[in-house]
Amino acid sequence: KIFSKCELARKLKSMGMDGFHGYSLANWVCMAEYESNFNTQAFNGRNSNGSSDYGIFQLNSKWWCKSNSHSSANACNIMCSKFLDDNIDDDIACAKRVVKDPNGMSAWVAWVKHCKGKDLSKYLASCNL
């Protein structure tokens, strides 16, 4: 499934992500845009450490989920393949776990590069949230 920006914003808001650990809704949506282009089936198997990234938030198999190809800390206690389906409830639950670590949203390189410290005040203006 490919979400629209506003559709994802509404979903994230309904799951309590606006202000979660101090990050505005716009930060979460911006991160998803640059990580996956809002695509729940996004997959990147080309990380230098042999790990892969899964789903709309590009959750990494070395730390957050279990894949069959290598060992994992599996901090979200889930199979990585679950992050590739249309239901993003489990992806959101795992993102909440990720952001509780000291790095916060800096765990996402695309967020650091494209969203961190930027003026996102108008980012969701058209969504009528």
Swiss-Prot record:
Protein name: Lysozyme C, milk isozyme
PROSITE patterns per record: GLYCOSYL_HYDROL_F22_1, GLYCOSYL_HYDROL_F22_2
CDD domains linked: LYZ_C
SMART domains the record matches: LYZ1
Subunit structure comment from the entry: Monomer.
Keyword Metal-binding applies: yes
Top-level taxon of the source organism: Eukaryota
Gene Ontology molecular-function annotations: lysozyme activity; metal ion binding
Family (UniProt): Belongs to the glycosyl hydrolase 22 family.
GO terms, biological process: defense response to bacterium; killing of cells of another organism
Cofactor binding note from Swiss-Prot or TrEMBL: Binds 1 Ca(2+) ion per subunit.
Cofactors named for this entry: Ca(2+)
Keywords from the UniProt entry: Antimicrobial, Bacteriolytic enzyme, Calcium, Disulfide bond, Glycosidase, Hydrolase, Metal-binding, Milk protein
Disulfide-bonded cysteines: 6-127, 30-115, 65-80, 76-94
Binding site for Ca(2+): 82, 85, 87, 90-91
EC nos: 3.2.1.17
Entry function: Lysozymes have primarily a bacteriolytic function; those in tissues and body fluids are associated with the monocyte-macrophage system and enhance the activity of immunoagents.
Note: Lysozyme C is capable of both hydrolysis and transglycosylation; it also shows a slight esterase activity. It acts rapidly on both peptide-substituted and unsubstituted peptidoglycan, and slowly on chitin oligosaccharides.
Residues that span the membrane, as ranges: none
Catalytic activity: Hydrolysis of (1->4)-beta-linkages between N-acetylmuramic acid and N-acetyl-D-glucosamine residues in a peptidoglycan and between N-acetyl-D-glucosamine residues in chitodextrins
UniProt domain C-type lysozyme: residue ranges: 1-129
Residues annotated as catalytic: 35, 53
